[in-house]
């Protein structure tokens, strides 16, 4: 199955999401990449998702809490260099997905996490991001890591494992890359994205 995503001229509307951790991480991150405001309803308030929310705030997004189920993320049109290191807490999803976004920015970011997260492997996203041109400083592919944002180039990546985090990371990176980024698993094209 081939899926190609091209940039739309305009995207408007409302989506009500279930209180799902995986969807919430991605909703927060995609909202951070928009030009304008996004309202998110019924988001997960788990610690991992709150780590993602805190990080996008540190990157310049403004968060307005409407009530206990709704918030608005105002991305202010562009991410900004963080003043402090970004704390991913215990969230591997936060670390891997935000790496895809940060790799294509025009600033340097530092990611760290708790003791448990600092033992978990990040090679599965660092390797393909480096193939796209990203620059990392790390200790054996583990946190803490420094990401030196740069202009990325699209790649055709054959993944040795099926991982939603790797797919999401590379598709997020592909949004800021020159050309087309394709992710293949077992020679089956799962996803591709072309930036403009």
Can you name each region flagged by the protein language model?
Residues 1-196:
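Structural preference for solvent-exposed beta-strand-turn elements
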């Amino acid at each position: 199955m081939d899926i190609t995503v091209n940039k739309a001229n305009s995207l408007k509307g409302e989506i009500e999401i279930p209180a799902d951790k995986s969807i919430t991480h991605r909703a927060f991150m995609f909202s951070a990449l928009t030009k304008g405001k996004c309202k998110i309803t019924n988001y997960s308030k788990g610690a991992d998702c709150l780590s993602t929310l805190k990080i996008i705030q540190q990157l310049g997004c403004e968060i307005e809490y409407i009530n206990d189920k709704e918030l608005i993320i105002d991305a202010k049109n562009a991410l900004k260099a963080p003043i402090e290191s970004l704390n991913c807490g215990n969230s591997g999803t936060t670390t891997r997905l935000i790496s895809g976004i940060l790799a294509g920015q025009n600033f340097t970011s530092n990611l760290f996490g708790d003791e448990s997260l600092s033992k978990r492997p990040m090679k599965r996203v660092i390797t393909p991001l480096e193939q796209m041109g990203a620059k990392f400083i790390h200790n054996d592919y583990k946190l803490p890591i420094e990401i030196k944002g740069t202009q990325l180039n699209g790649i055709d990546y054959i993944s040795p494992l099926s991982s939603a985090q790797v797919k999401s990371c590379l598709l997020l990176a592909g949004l800021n890359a020159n050309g087309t980024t394709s992710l293949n698993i077992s020679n089956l094209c799962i996803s591709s994205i072309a930036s403009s």
